[in-house]
């Protein structure tokens, strides 16, 4: 079926038409086949007189006077005399091919009542005979003659076919128009006979109209007369549509009339219920609906919040700022639109990824107060379906999520990773703004931190609050919340999210130092001392945090941990000296005890082996006294604790020189002598290696001519880890008795014995 649906190829049509015309031209046409006697066989009115022909067995019942023939002329009825005259024409005899035709032609069997068309297929012998005769008799001249006849007759055939088609269509149109006109005339005659008075009145009105507006009246008459033609064209174009429309209209009317009693009954019941409610409410005081009451309460709370703010949010353009903008669309599904109950634009929100794969929406609090719907690429949801996860009133920041299943798919969000405030750097970020239905991107430059937020140079307008700032990886770094007050800063301000464990940052503690963060790289860094700065309260789901933010410091602790750290002293959780605080986890390698190239070079130098028993006993370590909590202290203890804190703070501010290391006490002579004796015994009992030359001469071995080699005594290598002189003789000088600093093989001391040099 697919082949019938393909468009028709014009080349195939022309090729088929050419083959058909050639086929009809090469073979004799209807009514021109002659038997050997010269009588037309197609006429069906003469008897076969000898010869072999395919028409010998054809039945020829036909009337002698009239016979119907399939001719190309204007008339289909001819007499036997016309047929005989046609057969005697010299144009009908073109050779043996036509006189002895083996092809089967239509035979019209004429009867007074009907005509039947009988077709007889030729046999293989007849086809073979005609083909051999064609090859034998046809020459080049005959082929050229037939081709020229074809070229001359083709335009006539085409014009004749077109004329016949036009005549048929004209006859059809004439019949339709005549029938329609006769029907209109019959209607007019019937109306004139039935109501002659009204008919005369209508005719007078028609004449008046025709005299006043001749063109319009004539065009209307023409349209009425040609209505059948218009109707035929309309039915040909929209016949199926008209039928379906009629069926639908019929079905609707049927269903309407069938359901009319039930619809009427329901309307009456509704009217009765409404009237009864009105009558019962007439004696009662008027009540307000819960929806309107909630709306009024929401509006009043929003007004109170706006009036209670110390620094109201302003939306204005920065004068003199001209930033080049490029046409570009933001990441799809990240920026959401916030609207009020009337569908008016309020601001924007951003979809971000939180810790543990949770999805949240970040937006300013002043945008949240006026927002009723959150619109995404796929749909919208009410703000009442969301709950707060993170809220900082000082920064006007809010993170929300919803307990509704599949709310992200309903909105069509595609969240991006969220970067906390401790990783924001002073550089340019991408800010997308919408203007006239199109999105543009600009370079928003973060120039300085201020009050826990950022000063950003960007070109914004009222209604851009909530737009996110993206970095190069399209991570959400900060959120635009408006402009600073004109008396403070002329730039815009943006807030970032503080690192809350298990919400916006990892729960594992991160220790940072000058090697990881610096003031030149980030706007804020994790603080070692959080005693100064502004205190901010962060509310999350189920717990609260206190944050101290200074000019370049951010510290985040829960309330319980904050009290514990304050009771211990001025040293905080991120202090460098972790040995004084056993509760804090150890450093991962970035600290005072981190391995450096200098320490590694010192560790590579070999040190002489000593016995640990000869080392002096370590000094007893002072026991740590547990710090008493401040809530458990007496007033005298609190005063002493305050004094200790002040002294520690002053000592920390003043530069102090590191304490000098005390030299270890030199061992006694008896200890050195005992140590030397043990070393000599150990050296004498050691067997020489097989791979090195031995001092003995091999008698029955494999190398009898080998001589002993004299070893040269090496100078001892001085130790770089201590100032104690090395052990080099038995003169009773001091030696290093400390513990081993590496696990490399130690050079054993051999007093009074020569040693050969080692090979590298």
UniProtKB/Swiss-Prot annotation:
Specific enzymatic cleavages in vivo yield mature proteins. The protease probably cleaves itself and releases the VPg protein. The chain crosses the membrane at residues 172-192, 194-214, 218-235, 240-260. Residues 318-515 form the Peptidase S39 domain. The active site is at 366 (for protease activity), 396 (for protease activity), 465 (for protease activity). It is an enzyme of class 3 (hydrolase). It is found in: Membrane. Residues 572-672, 684-760 are annotated as: Disordered. Residues 621-643 have a biased composition (Basic and acidic residues). One of its GO terms (molecular function) is RNA binding. It is a multi-pass membrane protein. GO terms for cellular component: membrane. InterPro entries: Luteovirus_Orf2 (IPR018019), Peptidase_S39B_luteovirus (IPR000382). The C-terminus part of protein P1 and P1-C25 displays RNA-binding properties. Precursor from which the VPg molecule is probably released at the onset of the RNA synthesis. Essential for virus replication. This is Protein P1. It comes from Pea enation mosaic virus-1 (strain WSG).
């Amino acid at each position: 079926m697919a082949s019938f649906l393909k468009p028709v190829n014009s080349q195939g049509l022309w090729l088929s038409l050419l083959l058909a015309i050639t086929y009809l031209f090469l073979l004799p046409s209807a009514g021109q086949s002659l038997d050997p006697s010269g009588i037309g066989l197609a006429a069906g009115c003469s008897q076969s007189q000898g010869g072999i022909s395919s028409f010998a067995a054809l039945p020829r019942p036909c009337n002698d006077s009239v016979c119907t023939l399939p001719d190309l002329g204007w008339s289909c009825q001819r007499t036997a005399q016309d047929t005989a005259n046609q057969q005697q024409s010299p144009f009908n005899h073109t050779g043996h091919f036509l006189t002895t035709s083996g092809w089967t032609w239509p035979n019209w069997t004429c009867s007074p009542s009907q005509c039947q068309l009988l077709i007889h297929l030729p046999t293989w012998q007849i086809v073979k005979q005609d083909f051999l005769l064609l090859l034998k008799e046809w020459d080049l001249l005959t082929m050229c003659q037939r081709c020229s006849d074809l070229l001359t007759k083709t335009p006539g055939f085409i014009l004749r076919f077109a004329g016949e088609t036009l005549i048929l269509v004209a006859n059809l149109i004439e019949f339709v128009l005549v029938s329609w006109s006769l029907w209109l005339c019959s209607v007019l005659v019937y109306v004139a006979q039935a109501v002659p008075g009204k008919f005369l009145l209508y005719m007078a009105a028609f004449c008046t109209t025709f005299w006043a507006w001749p063109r319009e009246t004539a065009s209307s008459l023409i349209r009425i007369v040609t209505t059948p033609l218009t109707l035929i064209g309309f039915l040909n174009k929209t016949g199926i549509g008209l039928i379906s429309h009629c069926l639908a209209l019929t079905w609707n009317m049927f269903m309407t009339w069938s359901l009319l009693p039930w619809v009427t009954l329901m309307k009456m019941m509704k009217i009765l219920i409404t009237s009864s409610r009105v009558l019962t409410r007439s004696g009662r005081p008027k009540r307000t609906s819960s929806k309107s009451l909630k709306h009024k309460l929401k509006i009043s709370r929003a007004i109170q919040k706006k009036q209670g703010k110390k620094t109201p949010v302003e939306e204005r353009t920065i004068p003199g700022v001209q930033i080049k903008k490029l046409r570009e669309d933001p990441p799809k599904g990240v920026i959401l639109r916030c609207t009020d109950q009337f569908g008016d634009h309020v601001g924007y929100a951003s979809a971000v990824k939180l810790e543990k794969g949770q999805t949240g929406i970040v937006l300013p609090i002043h945008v949240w107060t006026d927002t009723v719907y959150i619109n995404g690429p796929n749909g919208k949801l009410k703000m009442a379906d969301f709950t707060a996860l993170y809220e900082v009133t000082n920064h006007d920041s809010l993170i929300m999520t919803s307990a509704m299943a599949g709310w992200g798919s309903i909105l069509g969000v595609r969240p991006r990773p969220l970067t906390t405030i401790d990783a924001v750097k002073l550089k340019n970020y991408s800010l997308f703004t919408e203007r006239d239905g199109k999105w543009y991107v600009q370079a928003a430059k973060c120039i300085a931190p201020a009050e826990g937020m950022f000063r950003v140079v960007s070109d914004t307008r009222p209604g851009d609050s909530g737009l996110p700032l993206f970095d190069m990886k399209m991570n959400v770094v900060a959120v635009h919340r408006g402009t600073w007050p004109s008396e403070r800063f002329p730039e815009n301000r943006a807030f970032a999210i503080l690192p809350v464990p298990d919400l916006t940052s990892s729960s594992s503690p991160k220790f940072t130092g000058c090697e990881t963060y610096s003031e030149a790289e980030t706007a804020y860094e994790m603080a070692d001392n959080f005693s100064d700065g502004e205190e901010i309260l962060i509310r999350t789901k189920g717990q609260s945090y206190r944050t101290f933010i200074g000019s370049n410091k951010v510290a985040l602790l829960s309330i319980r941990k904050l009290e514990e750290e304050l009771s211990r002293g001025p040293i905080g959780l991120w202090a460098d000296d972790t040995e004084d605080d056993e509760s804090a986890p150890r450093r991962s390698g970035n600290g005072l005890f981190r391995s450096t190239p200098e320490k590694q070079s010192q560790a590579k130098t070999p040190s002489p082996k000593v016995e640990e028993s000869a080392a002096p006993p370590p000094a007893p370590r002072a026991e740590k006294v547990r710090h008493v909590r401040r809530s458990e202290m007496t007033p005298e203890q609190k005063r002493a604790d305050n004094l200790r804190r002040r002294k520690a703070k002053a000592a920390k501010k003043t530069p102090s020189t590191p304490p000098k290391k005390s030299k270890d006490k030199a061992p006694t002579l008896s200890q050195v002598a005992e140590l030397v004796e043990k070393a000599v015994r150990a050296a004498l009992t050691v067997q020489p290696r097989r791979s090195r030359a031995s001092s003995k001469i091999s008698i029955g071995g494999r190398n009898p001519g080998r001589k002993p080699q004299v070893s040269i005594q090496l100078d001892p290598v001085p130790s770089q880890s201590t100032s104690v002189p090395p052990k080099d003789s038995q003169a009773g000088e001091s030696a290093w008795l400390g513990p081993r600093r590496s696990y490399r093989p130690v050079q054993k001391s051999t007093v009074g014995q020569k040693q050969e040099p080692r090979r590298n």
